[in-house]
Amino acid sequence: YHYVETAQGYSVAGWKMPKRWVFDFYDLLDLLCEQQDWRRIKGIFHTNQGWKAFNFNPEQFNYQDVEEGIDNRVELIVQNERDWMGFESALFACRIEQ
């Protein structure tokens, strides 16, 4: 499931993915950290290092271990239009085949 909304000069996009999907933690962290012009990135992922919650804002990059989630999900709030399909392809490339 994927959504994109634009309001008040910001673009918001989010993805919900099956709980059974497992992501490579370092590939995912690299992808999230290389994003540009974002206001907030928030997500929870089943990674090869356990379940992780990410909460990035301009003041802090924070991630931590969390209890198992109901699904994998991420939401990005950015200042400019974005190639969301490109981001989605890169996100799905972080997935580890089980």
Where are these regions (language model features)?
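C-terminal accessory "lid"/substrate-recognition subdomains
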Residues: 1-72, 80-85, 89-98
